[in-house]
A protein has these predicted regions:
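Secreted/periplasmic carbohydrate-active enzymes, especially glycoside hydrolases
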Residues: 1-158, 288
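Substrate-binding/catalytic cleft of secreted carbohydrate-active enzymes
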Residues: 158-178, 182-299
Length: 299
C-alpha cells in the first residue's frame, strides 16, 4: 500500500476555562504531529481554519498481529495552542496503521468467522483475560506485563477481555499494541438480564461512550462484543422472568450499542454477543457460523 489516510477531528471542550472570554476562541489553533515507528517526525501541521482534516501518510509501515509481521506504531500528538505559543492542552497516543474486520464469507459448511488484518485472515490463538486479582488495587502495569508476556511465550496472537470482568486500564491495550495481541473486547455484561429503565440506559450509554473514546485508537482493538453468553441463554429463557427482559435485551445489544458504535467507533467491528451467529436469536450455538462456547471440554 502506497499511502493511508487519517481522518483528524479534534474535539475542543471547556475553552473558557483556559483562555477567558468566548471572544478569544478564535486565537486557538490545533497543532498536529506524527512520528513514525523509528522516531522520524513525518507530519507537523497547524490546523487553524478547518480542524477536520484528512492527512496522508506515504509508504506506511503497517501493524500486524504477532507472527504475521511487525508491530509498527506511530506516535500521534495533538496540541491546542494559543497564538502566543502557549500549549493549552495535549493529546498524545500511539496508533497502528492497519485494517481489522471479521471475514464472514459463506462457505460449504456455513460461514467463516475469521479475524482479517490488512486483508489477511489470521489463525487466532488466545484465551480469555479475566480480572487478574480479586483486589484490583494489586493489579499493576508490572503484573499485567508479566501475564501478557506469558501469553506471548505461549504463542498467543489474540486475547479476549471477558464481559464478566471490567474494562482494563490503558496500559493493558498499550501492551497488546506492542506485543501484537489482537483484542476481542466484550462490553461489561455477562450471564444475566437487565431491566432497561431510563436511568439504566443513561448510565450504560455514558459508560459505552467513555470507554469507546478511551480505547478506540488502539491498533490491537479487533472487535467489540455486546455481552458474554446472554443471547443464547435469553433465547433459552434462562434467567428470564418476564417478556420485557427479552425486549430490553434486543434494544440494548441490537439497537443502542450498534448506534453508539456507528457514532463513536465506526471502524471497529461489532458483534452482538458471544456465542452468536450474528444476533436476533438466530441459533447462537450454531457450530458452523459465528463463534461457539464449547463447555464439554471442562464441565
Amino acid at each position: 500500500q502506497d499511502s493511508v489516510e487519517l481522518d483528524i477531528k479534534p474535539e475542543i471542550e471547556f475553552v473558557r476555562k483556559y483562555i477567558g472570554s468566548g471572544s478569544e476562541t478564535g486565537q486557538l489553533s490545533v497543532k498536529f504531529r506524527v512520528v513514525d515507528p523509528v522516531g522520524n517526525e513525518i507530519i507537523n501541521r497547524i490546523l487553524n481554519e478547518d480542524i477536520t482534516k484528512n492527512i496522508h501518510i506515504d509508504n506506511p509501515q503497517l501493524w500486524w498481529p504477532r507472527g504475521y509481521g511487525e508491530q509498527n506504531l506511530y506516535t500521534v500528538s495533538v496540541d491546542l495552542v494559543k497564538n502566543d505559543g502557549t500549549v493549552v492542552d495535549n493529546w498524545t497516543r500511539k496508533i497502528g496503521l492497519r485494517t481489522i474486520t471479521m471475514d464472514r464469507t459463506k462457505d460449504k459448511w456455513g460461514e467463516r468467522f475469521a479475524t482479517c488484518v490488512n486483508g489477511v485472515n489470521i489463525f487466532a490463538m488466545g484465551a480469555d483475560y479475566i480480572p487478574e486479582d480479586h483486589l484490583l488495587g494489586r493489579v499493576t502495569p508490572e503484573t499485567t506485563r508479566t501475564l501478557l508476556e506469558k501469553a506471548v511465550f505461549a504463542n498467543f496472537n489474540s486475547i479476549r477481555v471477558w464481559g464478566g470482568g471490567y474494562y482494563p486500564d490503558d496500559w493493558f491495550y498499550d501492551m497488546c499494541d506492542e506485543m501484537g495481541l489482537v483484542v476481542w473486547q466484550d462490553f461489561m455484561f455477562a450471564c444475566a438480564v437487565y431491566d432497561l429503565t431510563p436511568e439504566f440506559e443513561a448510565n450504560i450509554t455514558a459508560e459505552f461512550i467513555d470507554n469507546l473514546k478511551r480505547i478506540r485508537h488502539h491498533a490491537s482493538l479487533g472487535l467489540m462484543c455486546g455481552n458474554n453468553e446472554m443471547e443464547q441463554f435469553v433465547k433459552e429463557r434462562n434467567w428470564v422472568s418476564k417478556d420485557s427482559e427479552v425486549r430490553d435485551y434486543i434494544i440494548m445489544y441490537e439497537r443502542i450499542l450498534p448506534q453508539i458504535m456507528k457514532q463513536y467507533a465506526p471502524q471497529v467491528f461489532y458483534w452482538p454477543a458471544s456465542p452468536s451467529s450474528g444476533g436476533s436469536f438466530d441459533d447462537p450455538r450454531d457450530e458452523n457460523r459465528g463463534d461457539v462456547h464449547y463447555w464439554d471440554v471442562w464441565h
